[in-house]
Amino acid sequence: MCPPVRQHPAQAPPAKRQALETVPHPQNRGRLMSPKARPPKMQRRPRPPVAKRRRFPRSPQQVERPILPPVESTPQDMEPGQVQSPPQITAVIQLRQDRDTMRPPIYLPALLANCGPAGLLRAHRLPQPKPPCQSRQRPSPDSQTSPC
């Protein structure tokens, strides 16, 4: 008797099967090529734009700076026999949270005192100040509405 006829062809050993599966195109079947690690430049996907580094990384309001006390040196009050000692700086670094509760100095303009540092940035957006009321100086019968 003859051996039984096999319906399916025998599978290739695993090493050769893997080589056959990595053939990229049927026309390249002559030499077994694995797919390239990097496709050529035209087929690569474009890289997303890199986040730009900021030229000014933090605004001045976000930077915490130590507040130094004013140096008090009054040479008039000293006696002639006394030697002037260098001023002792006992600075306590106040963080930004403590500074927010302090009142601004009196000599600052009202806009800066009311709005803080952001008031200088918003100053150009504020409405123009109204002209002083002139209805008392020249009452005219043709103007019914006063400018103020």
UniProtKB/Swiss-Prot annotation:
Residues 1-86, 122-148 are annotated as: Disordered. Residues 38-57 have a biased composition (Basic residues). Keywords: Early protein. Residues 134-148 have a biased composition (Polar residues). Pfam families: DUF5451. Belongs to the Epstein-Barr virus BLLF2 family. This is Uncharacterized protein BLLF2. It comes from Epstein-Barr virus (strain B95-8).
